[in-house]
Amino acid sequence: MAAPAGPVAAQTSLSRLPSLTGMRFVAAFMVLVCHIGIVLVPSVQKPWLNWTEPYVYALGPTGVVFFFVLSGFVLTWSARPGDTSRLFWRRRLVKIYPNHLVTLGAAVVLMLITNHAVTASNTVPTLFLVQSWIPDQEVVLNYTSNAPTWSLACELLFYLAFPVLLPLLRKIRVERLWLWLGAVALLICTLPFIALLLPDEPVMTNTDVPWWPLWFTYYFPVSRMLEFMLGMLTAQIVLSGRWIGLPLVPAMLLAGASFVVTAGFVPEMYSQASAIAFFLALLIAAGATADVRGRSSFFRKRAMMFLGEISFALYMVHWLVILYGPMQMARAGGWSGHSTVSQALLEASLTVVITLLLAWLLYRLVERPAVGRWSRPAMRGGSSLAADVRAGPAAEVHGER
């Protein structure tokens, strides 16, 4: 793969990005809160909570957009001279597949224990992380299994394409990088309009949202690859010295404002593929440059770093805790129950605590040992280059998560 190029490459290419590690937890926690909220907010049935619904529901999609943009940014940032496609793909698979296999195995066991059907459609595509390519709700969503792994199917496409995209990215003239960034951001915004050409029926289960347009804009890996490319372009802008110097706090305010606008005032189909990706790219670049230049960043605090390290594991276990933990959403009628405010808060709190504990265990017992042992082929004498893998920021991303 090509080495970083540009006037600031020597300064930035080997720098760790702890702020982005901390941001990963925020994004993963947004997904967790979203999935808790889509159940508990309606179950409480309090009119004064109704205004929160669009914002709670938008937290998860926004977190996923962040992860996809972040993947493109960090992989481009940390691309090493002399790296091969085979080694790159090996590192990425070792990063995601051990956690995936363990959590999918746990999901199958829990489905059997609770008398939920285990079928080829809700397990085999998920096992091979191809479910997002199949526009079938039972395959993509499979609610009683580990449904959020649909995003890993998108990540696999990103990883497959990255060794091809990176040399093309390096060929773009630096003065045109912002033009390309704007073009990709605009293309993301056009996806819902392209989706209008797709059938309005069927609708997504328990909603009035047309399934085909939703699948195309939200689940289809090719559509989501635009966000990955946005992250790649953003990293190249920073590496080439073309960053506008936006500080971290203003970037956070811009991202927050874009979330409020898209979640509160834009129809769901459009808000899930919107300009928020552009503002999240600015936030990621601002966090990276804050680290490189030694500027203050809340996301570099030790607690945030720890939580960021376990964020991928958190993402992988949280849905199973929601289904089979205190909220018991996998039981019959679990999605249509009623709850008091105090009961909902208790169930939500227990779900968060259990998720964090299981995420830490999965990280310590599965993810970290697997990365340390298998990310690189063994050297002569039985040692490995895993320490080198851990030293690079590419080992610090969601899904890289």
Residue ranges and their predicted role:
Residues 18-21, 60, 124, 128-153, ...:
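Aromatic-enriched alpha-helical transmembrane segments of multi-pass intramembrane proteins
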